């Protein structure tokens, strides 16, 4: 299929610039086969049933945006594998070393070997790659990289959120209430609508919950640039499924209960690990690219926000719920003035069979 097959006209005013005042008061579009139902998110309880299994991504967004100086910013992308170690500096003080990939703006102002200081901590440019990507080395004085980012970094809101400045509330609202494993540089946004109260009410109804981890990388915002979508190269992201979670999911599959992925990240994690209809536990990386024709093994329903035209995520929902059906659904959502992208509204999709 061609990239242009996944295009549609999106009015810019529908790109949500701020979260709605209460998480669960965003709109929810139920895309059943019979009709569309537009409701408030807190009513999702009415559309799930006893025995359903909700699978969340528990990755936590880190403050991945750093100002190296007044003219250069970087957005961390991904922690490089097997990179962490502790050593001592010349004075015998403990120093932690950490390696990451990042995107620099403007990258042309950087060269390999450049050093930037944050009090007694240091960032070194170790490699320059294509399209503004760089590799960096953290040399930190007796703190972890996450403690460093909490002190010196900013929440990495997407570029399509165009505000004069960040708001303190973003530190809370661009984070799910259940996130607890640090590593994402963008939010798994379908989960932003959930409150602890809604999760507790779903459990009381008999809906089961489980958690996987996918650390969202900055590559999630990279546009597809090839007209032949099969030529697009996906970014890799770290995933993890515990043996306990795999057992819960496989039991639900065996009992033919519905598995509902909360967000495309949860879906990509589950489908990446699926073999012969079962989920395997473990830590792994995925570059899975889901397009129409993909054979889903694990997920029955998908809760997700509304996505960009010509994006890999719009291709994913077309693969899951139908190409024609998703173009029609998005046309309806635009007519209904629903809010798009990270701080926008949600839709509950059923797998097309």
UniProtKB/Swiss-Prot annotation:
Short name of one Pfam family: Queuosine_synth
A cellular-component GO term for this protein: cytoplasm
Membrane-crossing segments per the record: none
Reaction(s) catalysed (UniProt annotation): 7-aminomethyl-7-carbaguanosine(34) in tRNA + S-adenosyl-L-methionine = epoxyqueuosine(34) in tRNA + adenine + L-methionine + 2 H(+)
Compartments, record wording: Cytoplasm
GO molecular function: S-adenosylmethionine:tRNA ribosyltransferase-isomerase activity
Keywords: Cytoplasm, Queuosine biosynthesis, S-adenosyl-L-methionine, Transferase
InterPro entries associated with the record: QueA, QueA_dom1, QueA_dom2, QueA_sf
Pathway where this protein functions: tRNA modification; tRNA-queuosine biosynthesis
The family this protein is said to belong to: Belongs to the QueA family.
PANTHER family (alphabetical): S-ADENOSYLMETHIONINE:TRNA RIBOSYLTRANSFERASE-ISOMERASE
Protein name in UniProt: S-adenosylmethionine:tRNA ribosyltransferase-isomerase
Protein species of origin: Rickettsia bellii (strain OSU 85-389)
